[in-house]
Amino acid sequence: MAKCFVTGKKKSFGNTRSHAMNANRRTWKANLQKVRILVDGKPKRVWVSARALKSGKIKRV
């Protein structure tokens, strides 16, 4: 799984719990989008989280 270029977000781990409270391991994937941004003055395609895009931390090219 990819990692956010800006925030470093990646998938997180935890348990799903059944009605009987049995634990099963699962993952939650971050909402990552592949976008083109300027890195050192050159356009580059990177994975960026939706939160970083919405908050304006990154500017698309």
From Swiss-Prot:
A biological-process GO annotation: translation
The entry's keywords: Ribonucleoprotein, Ribosomal protein
Pfam families on file: Ribosomal_L28
Matches recorded under InterPro entries: Bacterial_rp_bL28 (IPR050096), Ribosomal_bL28 (IPR026569), Ribosomal_bL28/bL31-like_sf (IPR034704), Ribosomal_bL28_bact-type (IPR001383), Ribosomal_bL28_sf (IPR037147)
One example GO MF annotation: structural constituent of ribosome
Example of a GO cellular component annotation carried by this entry: ribosome
UniProt similarity note: Belongs to the bacterial ribosomal protein bL28 family.
PANTHER family, A to Z: 50S RIBOSOMAL PROTEIN L28, LARGE RIBOSOMAL SUBUNIT PROTEIN BL28A
Protein name according to UniProt: Large ribosomal subunit protein bL28
The species this protein was found in: Geobacillus thermodenitrificans (strain NG80-2)
